[in-house]
């Protein structure tokens, strides 16, 4: 029995020694370079102000990062109408046209052709 315990203990010591030398044990986490937080902590706030972040890609900004320009005609400008507003404006103009047509305000205009349907012809 004592001989089996000695062999077991020797085997465990051999396995522990081999796993430590071959790197089979618990892997340690490697540190791979500087992060912005560690650089700011170690170098101070003046290093962060001059740091060019990853969002400063010239010409490769995302939709959320587009700056709103005040100038007209530039991409991202407030004055440029969105396609949704064009659709809404067209629908509003069409509805106002139908309202004027029902009210009879368009009958007196000479430039607009009369659009009569088959139902209108049957009623008259």
UniProtKB/Swiss-Prot annotation:
Primary localization class, coarse: secreted
UniProt keyword Thylakoid present: no
One GO molecular-function entry: type 3 galanin receptor binding
Record-stated family: Belongs to the galanin family.
Name of the featured protein: Galanin peptides
Job of this protein: Endocrine hormone of the central and peripheral nervous systems that binds and activates the G protein-coupled receptors GALR1, GALR2, and GALR3. This small neuropeptide may regulate diverse physiologic functions including contraction of smooth muscle of the gastrointestinal and genitourinary tract, growth hormone and insulin release and adrenal secretion.
Residue numbers bearing the Threonine amide modification: 61
Keywords: Amidation, Cleavage on pair of basic residues, Hormone, Neuropeptide, Phosphoprotein, Secreted, Signal
Modified residue annotations for Phosphoserine: 117-118
Signal peptide residues on this chain, from the entry's feature table: 1-19
Subcellular location field: Secreted
Gene Ontology CC: one annotated term: neuronal cell body
């Amino acid at each position: 029995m004592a001989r089996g315990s000695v062999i077991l203990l020797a085997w465990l010591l051999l396995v522990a020694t081999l796993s430590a030398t071959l790197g089979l044990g618990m892997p340690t986490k490697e540190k791979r370079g500087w992060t912005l937080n560690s650089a700011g902590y170690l170098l101070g706030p003046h290093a962060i102000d001059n740091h060019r972040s990853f969002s400063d890609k010239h010409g490769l900004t995302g939709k959320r990062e587009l700056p709103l320009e005040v100038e007209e005609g530039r991409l991202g400008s407030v004055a440029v109408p969105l396609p949704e507003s064009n659709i809404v404006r067209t629908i509003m103009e069409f509805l106002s046209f139908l309202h004027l047509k029902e009210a009879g305000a368009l009958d007196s205009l000479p430039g607009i052709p009369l659009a009569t349907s088959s139902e209108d012809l049957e009623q008259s």
